[in-house]
Curated annotation (Swiss-Prot):
This protein's name: FMRFamide-like neuropeptide FLP4
Family under the similarity heading: Belongs to the FARP (FMRFamide related peptide) family.
Subcellular locations according to the entry: Secreted
Keyword terms of this UniProt record: Amidation, Neuropeptide, Secreted
Entry keyword annotation includes Amino-acid biosynthesis: no
Source organism, top-level taxon: Eukaryota
GO cellular component, one term: extracellular region
Upper lineage: Eukaryota, Metazoa, Ecdysozoa, Arthropoda, Crustacea
Listed GO biological process terms: neuropeptide signaling pathway
Coarse class of the protein's main subcellular location: secreted
Organism: Penaeus monodon (Giant tiger prawn)
Length: 9
């Protein structure tokens, strides 16, 4: 399980 990372540009 990978941590969900949301990158906002």
């Amino acid at each position: 399980s990978q941590p969900s990372m949301r990158l906002r540009f």
